[in-house]
Structures are given as structure tokens and as C-alpha cells.
């Protein structure tokens, strides 16, 4: 792995170009069969596979109807979690940092992710240190303006991932913020924090330690939207947000009436598309979508 040649490739994506092109994977082999990879996977309720397929297609069609281009990753038998493509890696400009899974059942996914990115012309970076577990955009969250980046650890990504991502993407240290997750129900940062296209940070306070929450409050300033545990458990933060025809659109599983009113008041169009079959595995719509906007969509600094 060569990191040094990335030093001149630091770029940021404008909020108007989030989720223009995404990676998804149909849930052909989706199931909950690995006990407690996260706190949601209790395996007490069986997955209704036909309903799961329908819910995925509804989410896919909703994105497509709002001019989001979808590139499909081929599902593989024996890899039931491939549907959660946000964990495949981190795409920054023309660079794809491929995930290094600590969870053994997901490790075979990596070779398929590498092929996907290489076939589309990305420069692929893979952690050479197997102790650097990184689970892609599950634990990497940029702010809407590309000025700040949150990197989480505590459950699925390693503490060391922070330094690796900083070097791999040539990100300034003062713009990359280390976040500690505390609640096992919010094992990835994208289950508890969401950066929105109008500059807001929506988050669940109970997911973070006090120091990490302070970073959210400092960066978000007057544009912070705290949510309660019920909205958090409905994966409100695990939604997809983009701009289409000047509308700031938020596509997610479920939002309380109070949260919907707040988001509407802030100028967001909320679209609910039920996704509860995937919540049984601890993921919602954002977990199923990876933003892969290529370098020609990016603004050089």
C-alpha cells in the first residue's frame, strides 16, 4: 500500500453532490444467521425474506425516482451481510479505502469490494495492518461542507483507524475528529449521527461519550438536532440525505411525528420507506447505500 502519492489528492465534496452515484447490493442471500455481530442480531425473530426483498426494492426505487444513480454489487451466496454496502469502504475523490473487517463472517466480502472498485477505475487502498479494523462509512462521517470528518471506534472499527484514515486520505488532523461509541445498539457512527445537507447534525446523545458529544455540539453549533432513543432505535440517523431539484430529501425507515415536523421546519422533505426487516440485522437504508461519487464530482481545494 502506498499512501504518500495521495497527498496531493485531498478534496471535498459539496453537499449538492452527495449520493449522486451509489453502490447497493440486492439482498438475495440476506439473513440474520450470525449471532450477535451487533446488539440487534438476537435471532429471536426470523427474517421474512420476501418482505426484505420488497423493502429493499422500494428503497432502491425511491432513490432512483429522485435521480440517484445506483451501481449494483453482485450478491454472493454465504455472505448475508453484503446488502450493507456502506461498510464496504470509504470513497474520497478517486480513492477507495477498502474496509478491513474485524467480524470474521464479513471478511470474505472484501475481495468482492476490491473488484467492484477496481472495475470502476478507483485507486484502491487496503490496510496492511490486520489490527486496523475499519468498517467503511459505517464509522466515517463527513460534514455537509467537507470541512470536518468524524471517525468512530468502540465496537467495530479500531482506535488505530483514525490515524490510518488521516494518512490514507491526507486529511488535516484538526478536521478529523475521533469519536467514542458507548452503547452497543449504536455500534457504528452512522446509526447515531447524521450530517445533513442544510448543515445540521442530527444525533442521538446516548450513543457517545461526553467528549465526543461535545465535538458534535461545537461543530454543529446552533444547527444540532438531538433525537430521542425511540427515533434512534428506529434508525432515523441511518437515512440517506441528498439534494434533487433544489429539494433537500431525507429517505429513511421511520421518523416520529415530532422529528418529522422538526425536519420539515428546517427545510427537509422526509420520505419514509419501511425497512424493518433489515433492522433485525442492525442496519437501515444508509447502511445499504455507499456514496461512490467519482472524482469529477468533487471540488479540489
What are these language model-derived features?
Residues 2-301:
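The feature marks the mature, well-folded catalytic cores of soluble enzymes
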